[in-house]
Structures are given as structure tokens and as C-alpha cells.
Amino acid sequence: MTRILQPISSSWIDYTDNESIALTIVMMGCDNGCPKCQNPEFQNPFYENMTKEFTPEELEKELQKLSKRYRTNKLVMSGGDPLAPCNIEFTKKFLEITTFDVCIYTGHDIEWVKKYNIKGFKFVKCGKFDYKSFRESLKTDEMMRFASPNQELYDDNFNLLSKDGIYYFNN
């Protein structure tokens, strides 16, 4: 089980395509220790304020209901960190059963993703948030700019799609 921020939200900017809206879950628990963390309370995997505990199966069921309302099969897993040691087994199990196209946001690098044999995602955004070079996220018809230019984007075959925080869509 893991704790998820409530309510589960939707956003068009978080998912790495230029097509549609995505559901976004915020998982509790993070081991990255980023300076000036945006949500330091989310580092605690047992943080209870406005969160609910889910099994992977319960989360999939809840997301299926929301996907009908928002008409999407896209999901962003954020946090905290979905690939923090306290969340890895939950995330792996969830990715095995989900029908969603998943984009994972992690502060870890791609070697961490490979080391733990994370599979079943469509995209993974790697790299600690760098508050010194923060810039507002932006999504246009041509590109998506991440909040931190040191973050990298990979596809499900571990191919590097962006190394500078900007992903250009293939139109």
C-alpha cells in the first residue's frame, strides 16, 4: 500500500505528449532530499493530511472511474517519488496491472530505473528538481518545457528524448 494525495487531479501540462489531459497522482515518500523541496511533507511515506492509502488494485479501480469523467487513458505518477525505495514495489505492481499510458516523474536517474527493472511506463522523467534553475513548465503545440532544465526524459525503451528539460513533439 502507499499513500496518495487527495483528490486525484487532472492536468494537460504534466503528460509528455501534445494530445490530451492526464490524471496525476502524487505519492507520499521521497528519498532524494532536494534542497528547497517544493513539498517537503511529501517526503514522509506516512504523511496523512489529505491522503488516502491504496493498494495497486484499488488505485487502478479509482483511476478507471476518473478516466471516464476526464476522458483520458493517460496518467502521471509524481510525488514525493514513485521510485523512492518505499514506493518501488507498489509502483512495479501497479505498472503490471494498469491499462493507463503512464509517465513517471522521479528524482532518480535512468540507471536507478534500470537497476530496479521498472517496466510498463510510456515515459519517465528523471532528475532532481533544481530550484536554482527553476522555470515555469510550459506546453505548446511544438514542445513541452520541464520545470528544471537538468531533468531528462526517456521512453519505455530507455531512449533519451530530452536532456535539457525541453521535449519537442514530432508533428
Where would I find each of the regions flagged by the language model?
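N-terminal [4Fe-4S]-dependent radical SAM core
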Residues: 1-26, 31, 35, 39-46, ...
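Structural preference for beta-strand elements that scaffold enzyme active sites
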Residues: 22-24, 74-76, 101-103, 123
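Short, surface-exposed acidic-centric catalytic microdomains
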Residues: 27-75
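Cofactor-binding loop segments of dinucleotide-utilizing enzymes, especially the Rossmann-like FAD-
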Residues: 28, 80, 107
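Canonical radical SAM enzyme core domain
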Residues: 44-62, 83-119, 123
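Structural recognition of alpha->loop->beta junctions
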Residues: 68, 114-133
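Conserved glycine-rich "GG(E/T)P / GGGxP" loop and the immediately following alpha-helix
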Residues: 70-97, 127-130, 134-147, 154-160
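Charged phosphate-binding loop/patch that engages nucleotide di/tri-phosphates or the phosphate backbone
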Residues: 152-171
